[in-house]
Amino acid sequence: MDEELDYLWETLGLEITAGLWPERDKIHPTLRPAITVMQANYRRASFLIMRMSWHAGLPDLKRIQASLVELSGMPTVISEAHLEQRQRERLQQQRIPFICPGVQAYLPFMDEEYWSGKPNKHVKVYDPHEWAQLED
């Protein structure tokens, strides 16, 4: 997970600390060897970052992410280096957080979106009115 944390810090200026998720034993035994789950902390927010040991398809990533949200009660961020633009757009439409190191981080639970694929990074912070519209 160092790649993700380095990306968030060096490119976007987000100082996030992380360690292995202490409740890892809640993950189904057949899935445990194939997934790395870190508990991350940023400001006062705590969330999970998940990464698969193989290149999983988007439906599998979303299914596993949803089960981790249910198990942990925390926002869970998908980390996948090979997400195509259309896949990232689909995740954004469904408000599923993700990190695509070197390209984009979408963290809606922090009311922020970050892109680093362009020379000047873009940070979008939602105001309460926009947030209410997104909830509909």
Label every PLM stretch briefly.
Residues 122-136:
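Alpha-helical interaction elements
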Residues 95-107:
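Charged, structured surface patches that assemble and position nucleic-acid processing machinery
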Residues 1-96:
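DNA-contacting interfaces and partner/effector-binding or oligomerization modules
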Residues 107-113:
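Short, charged, surface-exposed secondary-structure boundary motifs
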Residues 116-119:
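N-terminal intrinsically disordered, cationic/polar leader segments
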